[in-house]
């Protein structure tokens, strides 16, 4: 059985208007992680990544840099119990 993980992540810095959500979706699909990503009104980006632990860890690591125009200042990671509810990866508008 696979070792599953779920990370609930909040990314701070210049992370809106820099293609962060689309880049996160593309990378999540590449590494095989399910979940979602959205902008928050306070300027942060929030995301949930669920899947095989090694793939979720790759996504969390990616959040510390993000796409080339992003300037990540902080990443708050909350590890949660996997729910199995996520199907695919989507941008929430």
From Swiss-Prot:
Concerning PROSITE patterns, the annotation shows: ACYLPHOSPHATASE_1, ACYLPHOSPHATASE_2, ACYLPHOSPHATASE_3
Molecular function terms from GO: acylphosphatase activity
Alphabetized Pfam families for the sequence: Acylphosphatase
**Gene3D superfamilies attached to this UniProt entry:** 3.30.70.100
The keyword Hydrolase is annotated on this UniProt entry = yes
Q: What is its EC number?
A: 3.6.1.7
Q: Which residues form the active site?
A: 21, 39
Q: Which domain of life is it from?
A: Bacteria
Provide this UniProt record's keywords sorted from A to Z: Hydrolase
What are the Acylphosphatase-like domain coordinates in residue numbering?
6-93
Catalyzed reactions per annotation: an acyl phosphate + H2O = a carboxylate + phosphate + H(+)
For this protein, the record's NCBIfam families field holds: PRK14444.1
The Swiss-Prot or TrEMBL record describes its family as follows: Belongs to the acylphosphatase family.
Q: What is this protein called?
A: Acylphosphatase
């Amino acid at each position: 059985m696979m070792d599953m993980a779920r990370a609930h992540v909040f990314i701070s810095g210049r992370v809106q208007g820099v293609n962060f959500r689309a880049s996160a979706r593309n990378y999540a699909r590449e590494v095989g992680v399910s979940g979602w990503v959205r902008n928050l009104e306070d300027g942060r980006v929030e995301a949930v990544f669920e899947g095989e632990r090694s793939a979720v860890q790759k996504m969390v690591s990616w959040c510390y840099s993000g796409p080339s125009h992003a300037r990540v200042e902080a990443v708050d990671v909350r590890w949660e119990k996997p729910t199995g509810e996520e199907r695919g990866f989507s941008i929430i508008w």
